Curated annotation (Swiss-Prot):
Gene3D superfamilies: 1.10.287.310
PROSITE patterns: RIBOSOMAL_L29
GO molecular function per UniProt: structural constituent of ribosome
The protein's name: Large ribosomal subunit protein uL29
Gene that this sequence comes from: rpmC
NCBIfam families, A to Z: L29 (TIGR00012)
Entries under InterPro entries matching the protein: Ribosomal_protein_uL29, Ribosomal_uL29, Ribosomal_uL29_CS, Ribosomal_uL29_sf
GO biological process: translation
Family, as annotated: Belongs to the universal ribosomal protein uL29 family.
Length: 74
């Protein structure tokens, strides 16, 4: 993931792609937390960006679940 994925970019993704992004972001967050705990993390702002990306993905998934927003088929 780039430094802070935009919601508009995420809205273009399908459900499976969104789940893949979520798994990727969670794995990155785990690695960043591990680096922070061992004192190896240089960019602490990245932790915040990844957490916000995860929140954006969960928000979009919930919107789709409630029918607020649907997947735009390309």
């Amino acid at each position: 993931m780039s430094a802070g994925t935009k919601a508009s970019e995420l809205r273009e993704l399908g459900d499976e792609e969104l789940l893949a992004k979520l798994r990727e972001a969670k794995e990155e967050l785990f690695n960043l937390r591990f680096q922070a705990a061992t004192g190896q993390l240089e960019n602490h702002g990245r932790l915040k960006a990844v957490r916000k990306d995860i929140a954006r993905i969960y928000t979009l998934m919930r919107e789709r679940e409630l029918g607020i927003e649907t997947v735009e088929s390309a």
